[in-house]
Amino acid sequence: MLRTIRLTTAIVCFTLITLLFLDFTGTLHTWFGWLAKIQFLPALLALNIGVVLFLIVLTFLFGRIYCSVICPLGVFQDIVSWVSGKQKKNRFRYSPAMKWLRYSVLGVFIIMMVAGLNSLAILLAPYSAYGRIASNLFAPVWQWGNNLLAYFAERMDSYAFYEVDIWIKSLSTMLIAIVTLVVLFILAWRNGRTYCNTICPVGTVLGIISKYAIFKPIIDTSKCNNCGLCARNCKASCINPKAHEIDYSRCVTCMDCIGKCKHGAITYTRWKPKNETATNEDTKAKSVTTEQVDNARRSFLSASAIFATTSVLKAQEKKVDGGLATIEDKKIPQRENPIYPPGALSARNFTQHCTACQLCVSVCPNQVLRPSDNLLTLMQPEMSYERGYCRPECTKCSEVCPAGAIHLTSLAEKSAIQIGHAVWIKENCVPLTDGMECGNCARHCPTGAIQMVASNPEKTDSPKIPVVNVEKCIGCGACENLCPSRPFSAIYVTGHQMHRII
């Protein structure tokens, strides 16, 4: 029963989280966006103390339920492992924990996060890794299927579906997603939860807490006949059948061992110290030494202190920061500074909180957000206006961000946030290069920051050119996107390091 409940809940959570990345309309986020906000690392970076405490208490009570139910990457590995198990059953075996590797990776991860090297650290973040896979690899297939339905529906005079553009947002991010998928697939196919118990920093932290979980799978040595069936079905490879022991730091509470044991020797129940449960027949049971307990406590307290310090540092940073031309694709201009969405507050706040999960990229209806190719901000979204511009009536990216990189922003607030300003390039402007009237940028500026004036003040009939009022420009990119000049726009937006209210 427990295994069935766990499987059902995990499948529902996994399906809904995956759909959040596939849903290009953003409709599902109204009801299920909270599933992204209860992921451990995004909640920690967002200083969402309520969620972090909830996950810690959940782990302390029931073990690593988060890893087996809530984390989409963990459930994805379970699916791969389940398919693999159809061909070869009882293929797992116990293996000793590689503590040196687990804690080394965790230490490096925390150091990189504190040092601001998020673009490297987030390569290991489980939720973000799955988000990149879903956004870059699964979403194009989903969109292709949608376009196929739209094609046939249109011929039946139905407009229930509409076509969407399928495009590569970032080649480097897609390649990283492919490599991540291949590595995880191989590990899960061969060894189940190897990644979760050797590399994943979230799994290591929750593993330290789960050692002290109140409810755990317990082996009743009086019923166990040493058949080893539980160990051969343990995807975490954490059951030592010879010693009748379970490594609770690696156990993901999947309940598979309980369902496989034919003698009822494993039950999920309240843990008791061995000296309370030992019987005369159970001569093989070993009491936990004071030294082991002290070491475990030190590990737990050390990890807790490091993570608490990280949270405080992030909090302090947050306070301080406070058709006239040939039709061809536009090229990205060389911007002085990258552009970050309204609600990001500043470049510093955005880059230090963003986990590059690509959720905002997936829901952006105007195709403005795309992953960065810059090494220091690799995979973190930034704005570019070749395919669209940031419309004043859209705040979807701020609604879905789970990590606090983009703060929730109302429509009124967004219209007053200056994320950058427009820069005019005289050499590319159509009225001067082709001698034709234009004014596209001025007509579509939502704030009236662009005015058309005579290029020669002494001649009223001279071609009119745009003049940008930097104080009124909010950097939405309408001018850049709608400029007919090719391949580079005659006007482009450069970002501000610190966003301003105008």
Regions found by a protein language model. Give the residues of each.
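Non-ligating segments of multi-cofactor redox enzymes
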Residues: 1-244, 249-250, 256-502
